[in-house]
Amino acid sequence: MIRINGKEIKAGYFPDGSMLIKYLVEKKEKAVIEWQYESNEELMMLIFLTRHLQDKGIAQIELWMPYVPNARQDRIKKYEDVFTLKYFCEVINSLNFSRVHVLDPHSDVTTALLHRVEQMPVKDYIDEAVRQSGIVASHDIIFYPDSGSQKRYSEVFQFPNAFGIKQRDWETGDIKGLDVSGYIPKEPFNVLIIDDISSFGGTFFFSALKLRHLGAKQIHLYVTHCEDSILEGKLMEGDLIHHIYTTSSLLSKAHEKITVLPLRIEY
C-alpha cells in the first residue's frame, strides 16, 4: 500500500495489465510517501508516483519505508546468487528522495546501501510491547533468538536476558532444536522474545518450547515486521505463545492473538 501525505493511492489497470494511476498534485513544497509493502508491483507504482511528483515541481519528497523489501538477501554466497538488496537500493537511490526512513532493518547492509537514510526509533515500539506484556525486570527476562539479535537490542534495554543457539540441519536449513545461553531465573518467570522479523515463526516456536522447559510461564513475542505467513505457522496453535506484538509495517491480516502497534509517520 502506498500513501501520499496520508492519502492511499490505488492503481487501475489497462487491458494489457499495465498500471493506470491518477494523482492530483497539491501545490506544496514537500510530499511524504509511505510504502507499507504488500507486493513487488508497488515498486513500479512508487517509481511512477515519485517521478510524477518531481515533474509537477515538488522539491522535497520523503519516503517512509518501514519494512525494506529484499533485506534478507543482504549478501551473496555463490557466484549465481543475485544481490537483490543492492539492486533494489540502487533503484530507490535513483529516485533521489530527500530522506528515506526505515525501521529496524534486517542488517546494517541496508542502511549502508541507501542514500540519505534515517532509522526510525524501534525502542518506542518494544517499550510498548514490554508494557502491554506486563514483564518486569525484577523476575522476568527478555529472550533473543540468536546472538545477533542479542547484540542488536540488549544495549538498548536494561533487562535480564538470554539468547538462543540454533541447531540446524545444514543440508535443509531447517531448525532442529535450540540451546540457551544467558540468565535464566530459578523461579518460574515470564518472557518477552524480541526479534526484527517473523515469517512462519519456526525460530520462535522452538525458542518457546525450550523456554517452557526451563520454567517459563507466559511467553510473549515482539517482532518489528510480521509477515502474514505467521498465521499459517505453529505460533497460532495452543497457548505456547501467549501473545504477539508487531508494528503496522507489514502485517495486513488481523488475529486476536496479535496486537498491531501503529507506526508514527511525520508529515
Give short role names for the model-derived ranges.
Residues 1-267:
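PRPP-associated nucleotide enzymes
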